Amino acid sequence: MPIYRSATTTHGRNMAGARALWRATGVKDDDFGKPIIAVVNSFTQFVPGHVHLKDMGQLVAGEIEKAGGIAKEFNTIAVDDGIAMGHGGMLYSLPSRELIADSVEYMVNAHCADAMVCISNCDKITPGMMMAAMRLNIPVIFVSGGPMEAGKTKLSDQIIKLDLVDAMIQGADPTISDEQSEQVERSACPTCGSCSGMFTANSMNCLTEALGLSQPGNGSMLATHADREELFINAGKRIVDLTKRYYEQDDESALPRNIANRAAFDNAMALDIAMGGSSNTVLHLLAAAQEGDIDFDMGDIDEMSRRVPHLCKVAPSTPKYHMEDVHRAGGVMAILGELDRAGLLNNQTRTVLGLSMQEQLAQYDIMQTEDEAVLKFFRAGPAGIRTTKAFSQDCRWDRLDDDRKEGCIRTKENAFSQEGGLAVLSGNIAVDGCIVKTAGVDEENLKFQGPAIVFESQDTAVDGILAGKVKAGEVVVIRYEGPKGGPGMQEMLYPTTYLKSMGLGKSCALLTDGRFSGGTSGLSIGHASPEAASGGVIGLVNTGDIITIDIPSRSITLDVPEAELEARRVKQDALGWKPENRQREVSFALKAYASMATSADKGAVRDKSKLEG
């Protein structure tokens, strides 16, 4: 029978000092012996996805204490990728994931907490907490802050839906008036919550449902809706039950590695491909799997991408649907239900509700359930009122979107495409693979060939695009922006956005060893591995070289003879695989990250082999 970890600090005469300090935090005599549950919050006023989380920790803590636990809250950092985008701040985004994971480990292990509730929301916070959960392997429930409502405004006598990416595109488009650009800017992000499309934050919060680590609705229920409060309340109650099941009943099925096992990771990746999620999710799932000692790699993702169809198309891949529409169509449970009926889901995985996925779908998939409370839950909709307050409205759609032929979520037979929303490409320019979000690629660009135009950094690429140096038919190559080379593997949302604003979004491709925002669409290929700084062939490309992209064949090729590539490699070996003439200040903290970072095909995690021996 496991012993409560917290007993180390709460029992025995030799722990009198620790108990004295616990008492100073409010612990009473009859509390000692109860499980100590960490409430891992990420409130900050810097990030709209987290600005409303200040009171959420205490909401959860109150429910934990009512259910018989001791709740202790702490906070992690949170970087807003949108605000950090397009300047040196983006160097810090991906490395912050490792800091978040470490900070959770430090706090939980230093204070011997027995379990956790992780309150996350945005791009690197959910993955960082997930890595910590898999590393620590103590009972955990994730509950996120929820997505933002989609923006709306009237242009040309028509109401259109908006999000952050629309503001960026219009702001860079020289044909758009200042007045219209400002109108879109003011309308794009109307409420608290994670940005309203299927960007990285919402993708990751949806994946926690498929992994079994969060409750139904976690990925899709709006941050502003009153129904979301129930997710926080139930998380506080449920974590005490999970904790007691493990420590008092020796039930290891309550542990995250047994919930989010290999089959659950397959389910999460199937969901990601089916909903056209952010390509960043590949990095984060690979990283979390490594933390849990789960054998899951790019080969598994490649295999799955070839058989899972694209069932749900959401912004930025279409302006028609945002997360509020996904929720109306039944949310993640509905997508998983369609995957299950198509024979593409392992429905015997477990969830934090103590159910098998099959049992959970029977209760929460709107195409199966007759539970009126569940059907009402998925009719929760937007209010269209600017606010930074959680649970501030209780608007509902008149009816659910259960149209599985032409609606937001579709059956396998009526899929947006039989090819999934993400694909792994490989070839001599990316021997260990690269990722493309096929959900955002037009059909005519699934095969593309063109001359390279090479940039040694995102900054010079942006300058070149805006200066008109990039021409239709070219493949923009941005290198030395990988985990080591950046360092930090910057997102390339500005280059892709500016290509669109210059009218090149459908006539150019972009290849990088960096990564892309979940807001990216178009023929944008990232995560090229090995990266340039690690001796990858992307570092050998010259402007004018022909690059051939064939998504149906899952291939990407630099059409240069091997002998010529070898001659270029000898030259780069002598130069040390560094960008030419790049002026970039790199702090000690970022250099420390770069010194241990692996390439994207390994999840850009730290190379543990450097700590061995």
Swiss-Prot record:
Reactions the enzyme catalyzes: (2R)-2,3-dihydroxy-3-methylbutanoate = 3-methyl-2-oxobutanoate + H2O; (2R,3R)-2,3-dihydroxy-3-methylpentanoate = (S)-3-methyl-2-oxopentanoate + H2O
Keyword check for Metal-binding, yes or no. Answer: yes
Q: Does the UniProt entry include the keyword Transport?
A: no
- GO annotations under biological process? isoleucine biosynthetic process; L-valine biosynthetic process
Which keywords label this protein? 2Fe-2S, Amino-acid biosynthesis, Branched-chain amino acid biosynthesis, Iron, Iron-sulfur, Lyase, Magnesium, Metal-binding
Q: Which positions in this protein are listed as binding [2Fe-2S] cluster? A: 122, 195
Q: What is its EC number?
A: 4.2.1.9
Could you name the active-site residues?
517
Pathway listed:
Amino-acid biosynthesis; L-isoleucine biosynthesis; L-isoleucine from 2-oxobutanoate: step 3/4; Amino-acid biosynthesis; L-valine biosynthesis; L-valine from pyruvate: step 3/4
Kindly report, in one word, the top-level EC class recorded for this enzyme: lyase
Quote the Pfam families the UniProt record gives.
ILV_EDD_C, ILVD_EDD_N
Instruction: Note the PROSITE patterns from the entry.
Output: ILVD_EDD_1, ILVD_EDD_2
| GO cellular component term, pick one | cytosol
UniProt: Mg(2+) binding residues: 81, 123-124, 491
Cofactor info, note text: Binds 1 [2Fe-2S] cluster per subunit. This cluster acts as a Lewis acid cofactor.
Q: Which GO terms describe its molecular function?
A: 2 iron, 2 sulfur cluster binding; dihydroxy-acid dehydratase activity; magnesium ion binding
Q: Which InterPro entries match?
A: Dihydro-acid_dehy_C, DihydroxyA_deHydtase, DiOHA_6PGluconate_deHydtase_CS, ILV_EDD_C, ILV_EDD_N, IlvD/EDD_N
Give the modified residues of type N6-carboxylysine. Answer: 124
Task: State its cofactor.
Answer: [2Fe-2S] cluster; Mg(2+)
Instruction: Tell me its family.
Output: Belongs to the IlvD/Edd family.
Please describe the quaternary structure of this protein: Homodimer.
Its biological purpose is as follows:
Functions in the biosynthesis of branched-chain amino acids. Catalyzes the dehydration of (2R,3R)-2,3-dihydroxy-3-methylpentanoate (2,3-dihydroxy-3-methylvalerate) into 2-oxo-3-methylpentanoate (2-oxo-3-methylvalerate) and of (2R)-2,3-dihydroxy-3-methylbutanoate (2,3-dihydroxyisovalerate) into 2-oxo-3-methylbutanoate (2-oxoisovalerate), the penultimate precursor to L-isoleucine and L-valine, respectively.
Its recorded name reads Dihydroxy-acid dehydratase
Q: Which gene encodes it?
A: ilvD
